[in-house]
Structures are given as C-alpha cells and as structure tokens.
Regions:
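Conserved ABC transporter NBD signature motif
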Residues: 62-73, 81
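Conserved catalytic motifs of ABC-family nucleotide-binding domains
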Residues: 161
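Conserved ABC ATPase signature
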Residues: 140-144, 148
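Conserved ABC ATPase "signature" region
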Residues: 117-135
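The feature captures the beta-strand-to-loop junction immediately N-terminal to the Walker
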Residues: 39-41
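Catalytic Walker B motif of ABC-type/P-loop ATPase nucleotide-binding domains
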Residues: 165-168
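ABC ATPase C-loop
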Residues: 157-158
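Helix-to-loop junction immediately C-terminal to a conserved catalytic motif
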Residues: 54
Length: 199
C-alpha cells in the first residue's frame, strides 16, 4: 500500500487570470510505516502538497495514485481516501468548536457513523496517545494553552484511525518548548502506531 505522486504539478488561478505555480513535476512514493518530512520555505508548496495527499486538491498536471488507483478517475472514492489519509491543517487549533475536549475529538468518528461507545473509546485512545491529561477531557478546548489545543486537534484526526497522518507545519507558531513537545509527541505516535507520518 502506498501513495505515489507521478509528475504532479499544481497551479492556482489557472482559469482566473492570476497564475501561481505551487508545485512542479513532483515525483514521490510514500510507503507504509514511513516518517517523511517536507521541507521548504514559505510559499514553496508544502500546504498544497498536503492537500493533494488528502484529496482536497487534484493535481493540475500529473497523477496521484492511492493503493494503486488514480485519484483523478471519476469512480475514485475520495471519502475513503480522506478516511485513510488524515490531514492536520496548519494552526489546527483554530478548528476546535465543541464544548469539551472529549466531544471535539469524538466529532470525526461520530461523522464516520460509529457508535457512541466506539467514538468515546477512540477519543480516549487518541487523547491518551498525544499525552493529554484525562483531568482536562471535559474542559472547554478554548481554555487550553496553544500547545494543548494543538494536541487536541491532532487527537481529533487520530481518533479516525487513518493509515497515513499528514501534518501541515505542525509546529507553526509555537515557542521552542512547544515545538519540541509536539515533534516528540508525533515521533511517539509513529513508534506506537506504525502509521505513516508526513510532516
């Protein structure tokens, strides 16, 4: 099982007069259990790449293959792709919205149609995996520190049990201590789950 990018390019605004080349002729194979880092300066296309990996964007040119299937095909199941490739956006804490941490992490599994019991089990496992203190499970996510909010947001994606976890600049905006904590936590998640991690 793998994700293959075959000469993938992406252009923003192609039909709107303003053209911005975000990616050009990218070739990449992402295999099972890998830990991969995307490196580049601001505006180099890292966020565009993460959204292509999750199926939110379709390459302007070239192809992405997921489990041997071309994601551009009409009958390709994007819902399944998004369940198997979890995407943690840059500044994911801005997407928290529920009244408690636990409810926020349960949201994804609930929308997958899982039972309440299974949702709660997954939320507990994910929050524990990211090192979140159980005393804070029923606190409002808006009362947490920036680093804690980010852990909750990452746990929300992990609770859906994707096979690949793609994180768009997971340390953006954090202080040095927060960056080290988040990177250490991501490394631990990879070691415990053997999920493929792309960051």
């Amino acid at each position: 099982m793998s994700i293959i990018l075959d000469n993938v390019s992406y252009v923003y605004g192609q039909n709107e007069g303003y053209v911005k080349q975000a990616l050009k002729d990218i070739n990449l194979v992402i295999g099972k259990n890998e830990f991969i880092g995307l490196i580049g300066h601001t505006g180099s296309g890292k966020s565009t790449m993460t959204q292509i990996l999750n199926g939110l964007l379709v390459p302007t040119r070239g192809n992405m293959y997921f489990e041997g299937l071309d994601t551009k095909e009409k009958n390709f199941n994007k819902k399944e792709l998004r369940q198997k490739v979890g995407l943690v956006f840059q500044y994911p804490e801005h997407q928290l919205f529920e009244t408690t941490v636990f409810k926020d992490v349960c949201f994804g599994p609930k929308n997958m149609g899982l039972s309440q019991k299974e949702c709660e089990l997954r939320a507990f496992e994910a929050l524990t995996m990211v090192g979140f203190d159980s005393e804070l499970f029923y606190q409002s996510p808006f009362e947490l520190s920036g680093g804690q909010k980010r852990r909750v947001a990452i746990a929300g994606v992990m609770a859906m049990k994707p096979e690949y976890i793609v994180l768009d600049e997971p340390t953006a905006g954090l202080d040095p201590v927060g960056r080290d904590e988040i990177l250490g936590m991501i490394k631990e998640v990879h070691e415990k789950t053997q999920n493929t991690i792309v960051l």
